[in-house]
Amino acid sequence: MGRTSPARTGRQRRYVGRMMTVLVNGLPGAGKSTLARALAAELGLPLFGKDAVKETLADRLAPLCPADRWEWSRLLGAAAGETLWTLLRDARGAAVLEAPWLGDPLRRIVRAELDSAGVGVPQEVWCDVPVALARRRFEERVPHRHPVHPERPGEPDPRWDAWALTAGPLVLGPVHRVDTTGPVDVPALAAALRAAVRAAAAHPGDTDETREVSFRSQ
């Protein structure tokens, strides 16, 4: 096996320092998709959204849809999630990803997928809204969502009780808590993310994964 030259190793390290992986996370109804679209455009990065991939798969695979709509949603959701990581690897770690990564079990999975994409320190944007507001927003849009999503108007959804107790950021890198109860200053958020990436590149030995920055729009 050939040896990697010092110059090539340096270039690889500089590339890793410059790449920006942004995870836009939060409860359903927290405003993730809206913020992620605007943020990706501001940063000049591709956007990979779980629901967009899931709905596309559902449209193409509709003839295979089983009777159990919840199982169908789960299967396509898992496929969509795997697709996000494949796209991130192809993008060499430079992208905005948007999905609801909620619950401790997902933290280990996301960390492993980031490792496989060569991402050491992601920037996480947590869409910070009260649970009651997120739930109201979500329930208002249920009748208008793509039919692959299994929720139906008026049906109880016990997941909200669990989310109210446990939902929070993954904390796999710096967390930018963004108040999404109203309009967000996207250029200012993008500037904060760029500054955080520069700081991580300047101090590659800093492994603190607990830093949080509250970002409130004016």
List each language-model region with its residue ranges.
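Walker A/P-loop
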Residues: 33
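Hydrophobic anchor at the beta1->P-loop junction of P-loop NTPases
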Residues: 24
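Small-molecule kinase domains that catalyze NTP-dependent phosphoryl transfer to phosphate-bearing small molecules
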Residues: 143-189, 208-211, 215
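Conserved phosphate-donor/acceptor-positioning beta-strand/loop module used by diverse small-molecule
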Residues: 117-139
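ATP-binding Walker
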Residues: 30
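Glycine-rich phosphate-binding loop used to anchor ATP phosphates in small-molecule kinases
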Residues: 75-119
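P-loop (Walker A) phosphate-binding loop of NTP-binding proteins
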Residues: 27
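Conserved substrate/cofactor phosphate-moiety recognition/catalytic segment
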Residues: 37-89
